[in-house]
Design a protein with these regions (language model features):
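Secondary-structure "cap/kink" motif recognition
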Residues: 1-307
Length: 307
């Protein structure tokens, strides 16, 4: 009797064990059949010094050069966007495999219309994958180069379109800081308005900003003005068009020209642009400028005279 009871308990335990194994195998949690979370980051990001993002006619190359990232070896990259790029590479994880019914078609789309993201350490390729998504930009997919199984991607805890950072055109990678210079080398600022009576110049004299012709300037206002100018950032850059080129031939609302002790000149011409402002930089780029940040920079000369 006892022996029969023991056998029955053993059978029950074996059945329970089998159920546990099956539950673990087919549960929604990770199993041996799931793709590992680091499947698309099998590289050391600290060693990456070049990132190439290639798509149809929109190649972008980010190179680390002399403590700064450069875009296509033409201009400095926006530091904030570079941080977003590396955060995406570090945190993006496969959420699940793409269903077999759409695997082949999505693989073809990613290879033909997606962005090929390649990471390098010197001349050595550390990794590469295709990035893309649906038309609504609500679902992102990655496909490792040489593979035929795409994955739906996500950043745990966030609802973002993961592939968006890889799809930016080169112009949007440009440093958004308008006057990207070492302000300790500042020598002179010339500010001109449509009404010449408001024009003024700022120079450095004994390590202090002064306005020639103004015996006693309001230093608090002047220093705030210079701080605001040094921190002015573009919301975005625009590709050149005939309409923008035509606008640039008209008289600007304001023009700022900064020179440093090395003889380099940085300029900005400002125009009305819908509910914002449009700036034309010394590099010939059209920049959309936030209205709330530019209005304080339209102060005329008399504003800085101490009362």
């Amino acid at each position: 009797m006892q022996e029969t009871r023991n056998k029955r308990q053993i059978i029950i335990l074996l059945v329970l064990l089998a159920c546990i194994v099956l539950a673990l195998t087919f549960s929604p949690g990770r199993s041996s059949f799931d793709v590992p979370p680091d499947y698309y980051r099998e590289f050391n990001l600290r060693e990456v010094d070049r990132v190439e993002m290639k798509s149809a006619g929109k190649d972008v190359s980010l190179n680390f050069n002399n403590s700064r990232w450069q875009v296509n070896n033409e201009f400095s990259a926006d530091r904030g966007l570079v941080e977003v790029l590396f955060a995406t590479l570090q945190q993006a994880e496969p959420k699940r495999r793409v269903a077999s019914s759409m695997r082949d078609s999505l693989t073809r789309v990613l290879r033909e219309k997606g962005v090929l993201v390649s990471l390098f350490n010197g001349e050595n390729k550390a990794g590469a994958f295709f990035a893309g998504g649906n038309a609504a930009k609500t679902q992102a997919y990655f496909l490792k180069e040489g593979d035929d199984q795409p994955h739906l991607m996500a950043i745990p805890g966030y609802r973002v379109y993961v592939s968006g950072i890889f799809e930016l055109p080169a112009i949007q990678w440009r440093e958004k800081l308008i006057f990207d210079l070492n302000w300790t080398n500042f020598r002179k600022l010339e500010t001109n308005f449509r009404n010449p009576a408001g024009n003024f110049t700022v120079e450095m004299a004994r390590n202090q900003a002064v306005i020639p012709g103004v015996a006693e300037p309001d230093t608090a206002r002047l220093n705030t003005f210079l701080d605001d100018l040094s921190l002015l950032r573009a919301d975005e850059y625009l590709e050149r068009t005939r309409a923008l080129d035509s606008m640039s031939q008209s008289q600007p609302l304001a023009e700022y020209q900064i020179s440093d002790i090395g003889g380099r000149v940085y300029s900005l011409r400002v125009y009305d642009y819908d509910d914002k402002f449009l700036g034309l930089t010394h590099a010939g780029q059209f920049a959309v400028l936030p209205r709330e940040h530019l209005i304080p920079l339209l102060r005329p000369k008399e504003f800085f005279i101490k009362r």
